[in-house]
């Protein structure tokens, strides 16, 4: 029986699971009764995440006149919705950067995904009263090809076959090859992975249909 995208995600769920810290943070972020200090207490358990958050809060993007030195203050500056998106994006990048995919391919993947995320964020800012925040759309762009990483890691021989047969001059050739060789495409794999992480439906759908937007 041929492997499906659902089965591929299920068999690798223990390897590519988001840290427990994410679950705890999301619970607090979604709880209107929680305080910024309670959220900060969880973030401070991860030194790397704490440093990244302070760096972002002190960036020119937020333009705060004085230096932000505490996590709770950084949360106030960034906001809870944006914070959740930033933490998710950083956690996913860290998760796959520990993989055995060669560095050059991984850098190429994240460069493309980052450009998609930045483009999605800018487009969202041009829309009056958008349904989703610009930062949510940034994360959607960042994660849209996440299924490719899982295929590269779990099915390297088939991924190599797809790469060798790929013709960049043929529109949509990569995912058509995936359907032929695997029986499913990276968009299906990615959306199933995001489902297993219990991520927002908008991220699941943008990942699932990014090659078929007319089907959303």
List each language-model region with its residue ranges.
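Conserved alpha-helical "signature site"
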Residues: 1-163, 167-216
